Amino acid sequence: MDISSRHFRAEFLQEWQGSPDAPYFDPSTPRNITGLVGHPVRLLCRVKNLQNRTVSWVRHRDIHLLTVGRYTYTSDQRFEAQHKPRSEEWALRIRSPQRRDSGQYECQISTTPPIGHAVFLNI
């Protein structure tokens, strides 16, 4: 690799990754979750460098905001936000999931614009 190729690659990676202290999702987090009807299931995302931003879970089927931070914003009592202080893990727990709960969910970081990590649930 010559110097100009390395320089281009370095510029591209810097632009693609954004600021070195910007929040990002741990790419090793599972994107496909399979659960059983009636058995609790947990959707997970790991966020690095969150700083003062918040994490939310959104159900794509109806663009329903389910959680913000550790607070649950849906009247459906089966959904629960889970997060341990000082942890990088943010989870959405669904008690007694049904087949209709299958589909895409998104863990979002409150950047401008928001960035998301899609998780697909199959019940």
Language-model segments: residues:
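Repeat-scaffold signature, strongest for collagen triple-helical Gly-X-Y repeats
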Residues: 24-27, 36-37, 49, 75-76, ...
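N-terminal edge beta-strand
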Residues: 13-41
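Beta-strand elements of modular eukaryotic interaction domains
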Residues: 31-33, 46, 68-70, 80-83, ...
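N-terminal V-set
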Residues: 1-24, 48-80, 116
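Aromatic sugar-binding surface patches on proteins
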Residues: 82, 86-91
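Generic serine detector
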Residues: 4-5, 19, 28, 56, ...
